[in-house]
C-alpha cells in the first residue's frame, strides 16, 4: 500500500483528501513508513470522522485535518521523531519533525 492508495481510500469513505508530494531530497523507507503509520494513527484517533486531510511532503511533512472534535496534542514518535500540533481554523496542523526541531507557523 502507498500514500496514494491511502489517499484514495480516504476519498472513498468521504474524506476530502489531497496529497502534495514533492520532497526536496530522497525520503528513506523508514521515514515513508513512519509517515504512513502517523497518518493511520491520526485517522484512528479521529475515528475516521474527518472532513478533510491535506498531506504535504516537502522539506517538512505536514498533515492538515479538519472536521474533528478530537483534540490532538504534540507528542513523541518512534525513531527520534515527534508530532508538533497547531490549532488552525476548523482543525489542526500536525507536523512530523525530528525530535528537538520546531517549525514556526
Regions found by a protein language model. Name each.
Residues 2-27, 31:
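Helix-loop-beta hinge of the Bergerat
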Residues 20, 54-56, 84-86:
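Solvent-exposed beta-strand sheet faces enriched in polar/charged residues
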Residues 26-54:
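Conserved ATP-binding N-box helix of the HATPase_c
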Residues 37-40, 65-78:
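Short, hydrophobic/π-rich interface segment
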Residues 48, 52, 63, 100-104:
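Cytosolic C-terminal regulatory domains/tails of membrane transporters and channels
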Residues 74-105:
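Flexible, glycine-/charge-rich segments associated with ATP-binding catalytic modules
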Amino acid at each position: 500500500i502507498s500514500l496514494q492508495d491511502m489517499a484514495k481510500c480516504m476519498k472513498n469513505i468521504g474524506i476530502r483528501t489531497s496529497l502534495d508530494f514533492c520532497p526536496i531530497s530522497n525520503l528513506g523507507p523508514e521515514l515513508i513508513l513512519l509517515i504512513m503509520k502517523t497518518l493511520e494513527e491520526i485517522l484512528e484517533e479521529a475515528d475516521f470522522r474527518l472532513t478533510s486531510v491535506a498531506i504535504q511532503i516537502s522539506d517538512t511533512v505536514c498533515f492538515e485535518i479538519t472536521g474533528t472534535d478530537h483534540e490532538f496534542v504534540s507528542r513523541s514518535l518512534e525513531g527520534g521523531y515527534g508530532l508538533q500540533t497547531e490549532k488552525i481554523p476548523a482543525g489542526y496542523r500536525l507536523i512530523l519533525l525530528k525530535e528537538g526541531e520546531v517549525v514556526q507557523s
